[in-house]
Amino acid sequence: LEAAHDQRLLDKENEYVVLYQLLMRAEAPFKAAKVIDYGIKEEFVEENEKHLKYLAQAWHLSQELDKAEPVYKKAAEKAKDGELYVFLGQIYLATDRLNLASESLKKGLEKGKLKDPVSVNILLGQVAYEQQKFDEATTFFRKSLDKVSDIKGKNEEDTFKKQDKLRNQALKWLTYTENERERVRILNLRRKDLEENA
């Protein structure tokens, strides 16, 4: 199939999708992205949510974040759930665009039907922490803790492990954030004292 694609012999959506899946299984996401991208551009493959998601994920796994970002955006707008906004938010976070990360992650929560809303709240808390919005960060970490019991696994043991891991993660971030908020408060008081006594 790959040779047929190289010679531009593929002309059916199914052929492009199968080749994409084979390349992804072979851990060749860059090639997979090129294949599905060509298929979409040449209109052999329908530009729908599913195929855009394939393309975005392949670019993402290829570390081609600049190419993944606009495709995630387009796919997220078409999606029925918020998962693709979460992926987009992770790209923004990885590239230090914190306002966009926060906006995208919040859109993901609003759209709903997320596999793991607890992790999204933790991510939002981390973004707020990085912006030194400690009260907002604390709110997100507390929301995470409130929703941990909603997370389900394959079985009881898996559920316990997932919940425990997320609970510990949220608690560590919450403690860290509260300590940092206090440290910054004390530094600001000292700075104010120094300015008044100068």
Positions of PLM-derived features:
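Short, solvent-exposed mixed-charge patches
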Residues: E196-A198
